[in-house]
Design a protein with these regions (language model features):
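Short, glycine-/small-residue-rich phosphate/pyrophosphate-handling segment
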Residues: 111-136
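N-terminal beta1-alpha1-beta2 submodule of the flavodoxin-like/Rossmannoid cofactor-binding fold
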Residues: 1-108, 112
């Protein structure tokens, strides 16, 4: 059994299906003896916008932007990472795209020389929620 589970959720609405599914995933992990941490990108105040600082880091001209480091630490501590989010207009929400662009990045998740990054050998589960009223 994996010991450390990180559940990442992204939905601006509290009491959403996203939050319920993320909480259920975390509760199931705890019932089986794991520890679970839920990271809600909205509650964290995560900024998904890829900036000049992110680009400078990617090019090797600047350090990792400080606001992404705490999230990277939580990711690095996890054995299993579960991403839980709704589908908007046939794709992931901007917050999740920003997570990939800004946090799951060069120098952390991978290295240009091919050496394993901090997320090597992690198990990832992606739970995408779809459905809605007929008007959508």
């Amino acid at each position: 059994m994996s010991n450390n589970i990180l559940v990442i959720t992204s939905n601006p609405e509290k009491d959403s299906m996203t939050d319920a599914v993320g909480a259920a995933f975390a509760a199931g992990a705890v019932e089986r003896g794991a520890s679970a941490d839920v990271l809600d990108l909205y509650d964290e105040g995560f900024n998904p916008v890829y900036s000049a600082a992110d680009r400078a880091h990617y090019l090797g001209h600047a350090p990792m932007p400080e606001d992404v480091v705490p999230i990277q630490r939580r990711l690095a501590q996890a054995d299993v990472i579960a991403l839980v989010f709704p589908i908007y207009w046939y794709t992931m929400p901007a917050m999740v795209k920003g997570l990939f662009d800004r946090v799951i990045c060069r120098g952390f998740a991978y290295h240009p020389d091919g050496t394993p990054g901090a997320l090597a050998d992690r198990t990832v589960r992606v739970i995408m929620l779809t459905g809605g009223s007929r008007q959508w």
